[in-house]
Regions:
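N-terminal hydrophobic/helix-forming segments and targeting peptides
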Residues: 1-205
Length: 205
């Protein structure tokens, strides 16, 4: 497998509904080796190689779980909602990246009320995501807005891609960036004039 391509795909931000970065990487990879690339109205693409024989499609979804900004408070903290399936306790203290409407990436971290400010009962209960916030180092709502962050901006989790041992990789969104990388590699390497091979990058799994 092309580990360099897989790393590029995993490190891209592509929360469901905002798959542009992954799509651009795949299109740039596939354009030299396919006959045609078409798009649908939602942002999925279909790359075709060949034009006769049985049709074979390999599909990988480009999106990942993430968050969306729902509110900016007067102290400069971002409130958010989840996109996709999340276990609340895995979110706290996670580093994230906010992608603004202009494509600027702003780092942040998911926080909550400090433990010493919680009651004993609260300390025994898991936090829900609506008790958390994202801190981007701003001191006010005005400072957040000056940086270009708006309600509706997408937020992706941050995780470093790494190779462990001889045959393991770790990173975010491996489901299904591995599928996308395999799809691209098949289109690059399979040369069978007896089939029509399609590679599909789908959105909003």
């Amino acid at each position: 497998m092309n580990i360099e391509l897989l790393q590029q795909l995993c490190e891209a931000s592509a929360v469901s509904g905002d798959e542009q970065e992954v799509r651009d990487i795949l299109i740039n990879t596939l354009e030299p080796c396919v006959n045609e690339i078409t798009f649908d109205g939602l942002g999925s693409f279909v790359a075709r190689k060949g034009n006769k024989g049985p049709k074979v499609a390999v599909v990988g979804h480009m999106d990942e779980v993430g968050f969306m900004v729902t509110h900016i408070d007067e102290s400069g903290f971002l409130r958010f909602t989840t996109i996709g399936g999340w276990w609340n306790q895995s979110m706290l203290n996670h580093r994230v990246t906010i992608r603004t409407h202009k494509g600027v990436k702003i780092p942040g971290v998911i926080g909550s009320v400090a433990p010493h400010a919680l009651t004993e009962k609260q300390k025994q209960q898991p936090l829900s995501f609506d008790e958390m916030f994202i801190d981007i180092g701003a001191n006010s709502r005005e400072e957040v807005e000056k940086r270009g962050v708006e309600i509706g901006d997408f937020i992706s989790p941050e995780a470093n891609f790494a190779c462990w041992g001889e045959d393991k990789v770790v990173g975010k969104a491996l489901d299904n960036r591995i599928g996308c990388a395999m799809m691209a590699e098949l289109l690059q390497t399979v040369n069978n004039p007896e089939i029509t091979l399609y590679g599909v990058g789908s959105v909003e799994e």
